[in-house]
Amino acid sequence: MSRAVRACAAAASARVARSVSNPRWLTTMTDLTLSDSPVATIEAALALHQADRLEEAETLYRRILDAEPRHADALHLLGLIGHQYGRYHEASELIMAAIEIKPDAIYYYNLGNVMQANSRPAAAAECFRLAIELRPGYVDAYNNLGNAQRLAGNARAAVDAFCQVIALQPDHGQAYNNLGNALLDLNEIPAALEAYQHAVALRPELPEPRSNLLFAYHYSDAFDPRAYLDEAMRFDALVTQRAQPYTTWRVDLAPRIGRPLRVGIVSGDLKAHPVGYFIEGMLAHLKRERVELHAYATRDVEDDVTARIKPRFASWTSLASLDDAAAAARIRDDGIDVLIDASGHTIHNRLPLFAWTPAPLQVSWPGYFASTGMRAIDYVIGDRYVMPADEAAHFVERAWHLPDSYLCFTPPAIELDGGPLPMLANGYPTFGYFGKLAKLTDHVIDVWSRVLRDVPDARLFVKAPHLDDSREQHALAARFAAHGIDAARLQFEGRSPRDEYLAAYRRVDLMLSPFPYPGGTTTAEALWMGVPVLGRRGARFLSHICESLLQAARLPEWIAHDDDAYVAKAVAFARNPAELAVLRTTLREQVLAAPLCDAPRFARHFEDALHAMWARRVDAAPRAAS
């Protein structure tokens, strides 16, 4: 066991039972009158609530409060219904009113859950702390405290919280899963993988830890495509065993002549997220007579990007409250021809519902970079760079190549130029990396240190989540120090709003893309800001992404074939400020005119791909509609 996981397990002690019991009996509204005893009435309302008869439960809670306005349990439980309906302000007001009457650990706990759902992790963390003060050893509160701290950017504190859960309840599989998430944030890859493996061993029936394990594998220097695919196929076996796949659909398996393909996209990232950034431009140029889009959001979180793309969909359905069977039934009933998984094994995915085959043709694009392992998914959309023929064995799905890149970048809706080349004023070159710390493997640190040694006056600017924590800064500086790089040559900065983040590119002369997990969105953003990106060719879909984007931006000379070429190119480019200065003023125009940002061109290719896949599906196994 790693030290991080071993430390959690070593503190194991007594288990803590859950505090909320199931209702003992169920009744109907017609059985109740206000003359019933208060205990019986609240238990009846709770029974309705637990049976998911929310409207009836809400009515009864309100009747209780009409008779007894300071009934703390009714206020609290009515707040929970508000939470379930997404009425977060109302929910928090009701639960806070209950707390004012009767401070209770579970009230604070559920108030924390409301704050968490409403994207207020710092407030949520405070609620969970108060719950723990009232009930020491409150396992669920510690677990959710860790989740809130992680979302608030304090992964170190989150690790401590999850370790406390494991100390109280050593077989808490979800806590090990959450611990893995926090360790991954902190770039402790072996410990994260081990935590996920513990979660899978403790809760083998849960898809989430398996997905997280698969996702985390990609950060490891020891990644093995065959081992990854074997694990992905075990995930498929688990979810397929539970599914009841459809074999008939409410669509005609016939050529789509004179009417569009009905295409569903399942995603939790239809927002300010790489998925949102890469589909937004294309959506505006799809021909509705060819493709009719339907969104299936896996979570109810929306923002400005959501507001811009939502009108491009013929329908928008939330799957957040539906289990896989119900979600699959809904999609099938909607008559979807092609269903796209836009998440893969990333967070907020709903891959298990694809095992139900709610659509006759199922595709993975654009939110993942490897095989899902799902036999029910027919194709992965890629391109000749990310899915070369000699890597077909990495997938259970078939490859479908788009003519250019498989991605089309939407330029930010922010008026901001790249500014002058910094090294002209500074007198030295500044390399940059903006992204996750977990991508900075020991191999990357070694190669980048070689670059810095060969350009002795250069600086490296790293901007990453968690680097506003001095402990993380010292840890990263120590890794470079082990290769002889002085901390004075390093500049670290944490997360910032997107406009400030984009402005930070003005302080960089050229970007270094890591490997084997390169920058995707960050590569495109840098190019748009006039900052060229040096990439390294890899040996699987993920490690080819930067290569694909650079080819689509017409910058093939910025792709290195191996470590030595990467170092040589970095040194040569850094010593040629004249060329970098020209790129600074011309690169945005070049990128906007290149396939990388040509949304109309990409939309035609995307439509053609969907219709060609559909034609093959029709030819392969035509079936009558049910």
Identify the function of each model-found stretch.
Residues S2-Y428, D446, A478-I485, F492, ...:
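Alpha-helical solenoid repeat scaffolds of the TPR/TPR-like class and their adjacent stem/linker regions
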Residues V266, F434-G435, K463, E493:
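Short hydrophobic "strand-cap" motifs at the C-terminus of beta-strands
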Residues R290-E292, S449-A482:
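A conserved nucleotide-sugar
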Residues G432-H443:
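Substrate-binding clefts and catalytic carboxylate motifs of secreted carbohydrate-active enzymes
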Residues P514-P516, G535:
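A short structural motif in glycosyltransferase catalytic domains
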Residues T522-T523, C546:
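Short glycine/serine-rich donor-binding loops of glycosyltransferases
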Residues A526-W528, Q551:
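Short alpha-helix at the nucleotide-sugar/activated-sugar donor binding site of glycosyltransferases
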Residues S543-R554:
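Short acidic/histidine- and often glycine-rich active-site loop of Leloir-type glycosyltransferases
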